[in-house]
Amino acid sequence: MSIMKKYIHNWDELTAEQQAKAKEQFKGNPGLNASVVHPAAKFFEEHKWVKIDRFIDRNMANLLYHHVQLEAARLNYLEEKNIEYSGDTYGIFNDTQAPGDFSKYGDPIMDTLLSLSLEQMQTLTATELVPTYSYHRLYTTGTELERHSDRPSCEISTTLCLGYDNSNVDASRYPDWDWPMYIEEKDGTKLPIHMKPGDMIIYRGCDLKHWREPLWGKNHAQVFLHYNEKGGEYDIPYDGRPLLGFDASFRSEESLTRQNKLDKDLQERQAKEYVTENKVIDTSKKVIY
C-alpha cells in the first residue's frame, strides 16, 4: 500500500481535494514527511520500479555467486551419473522460463537474505510487506527471458545481481559489457537497466512487463526476492509455506487454491493488454560453466 494508505484505509475513495488536504494535515508525521521518506520510495511510487546500487556488498555477492555455481555443478554431476535426486532439494534444469539453466526455489540462504532484507525493502518502497519466496538462477550463453509479467506472489519483486562471467565477450569492442534487464513502463517506454554484482532492481512485477535479450556471456547469476503488500489482495506469507527455507512441496493446499484463483484473475486482466504466443520449449540442460 502507498504511504498514505497505511494511515487512511479508504484513501482510494477520497477525492483529489480530500487527499491533498489529508497530506497537508499529516505533514507533521515523520512517517509521511517527504523530508524523511527515502528518495527511492518516491521514485518507486511514481514509476513502479527503482534501481538500488550495492544493495549488498561485492564480497557477499561474490560468495552467493560461487554458491550458485557450486549448486549448478552439483546438480550437473547428479544428472551425468544418473543419480536420482529431488528437484526441490537440488534445483532443476527444466524451468520453462529459462530452459536448460539451473534454477532453485526457496533455498535457505536465499530465503534468509529475503527475510533480512525486509526492513530495508519497506524503507525503499514505503510499503508494509510480507516476504513470500526467493528464487535464483544461473543463466548461460544464449538464454533469453521473454517479455512477461509475474504471478501475484511476486507483487513487489527484486532481481539482485550476484555475479557473472563475461570473459568470452570481446572487451575491445564491448568494454564493461553487462546483461541489462528491460522494463516497459506504463507509457510504453522500454528501459534497459544495467547491474553490477550487488546491484538490485525493485519492481512491481505484476504491473510491468520485463525481459532480457539473449545473454552473450558465459554465465550470469541472479536471485529474485519476492514480497507482497501486507494486508493486500495478494497477502500470502511465505508463499503458503509454514516457514521460509522450505521447498515448494510445503505450500499448503489452502494457499495453492487461493493462489491459483489469483493467478487466473491476474492472467485474465493481463490478457486484455498483451498478446502472448504458444511456443514449444526445449528444456534440455545446457552447458554448465
Language-model segments: residues:
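Conserved double-stranded beta-helix
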Residues: 93-103, 112-175
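Catalytic phosphate/metal-binding cores of nucleic-acid and nucleotide-processing enzymes, i.e., regions
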Residues: 35-52, 128, 135, 174, ...
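A structural signal for short, well-ordered beta-strand segments and their strand-loop junctions
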Residues: 51-53, 130-132, 202-203, 224
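Double-stranded beta-helix
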Residues: 219-289
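Catalytic core of non-heme Fe(II) oxygenases with the double-stranded beta-helix
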Residues: 141-207, 219-223, 229-243
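Non-heme Fe(II)/2-oxoglutarate
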Residues: 3-11, 16-124
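Surface-exposed loop/turn and secondary-structure junction residues enriched for glycine/proline
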Residues: 59, 96, 139, 148-149, ...
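Short proline/glycine-enriched turn/loop segments at secondary-structure junctions
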Residues: 212-217
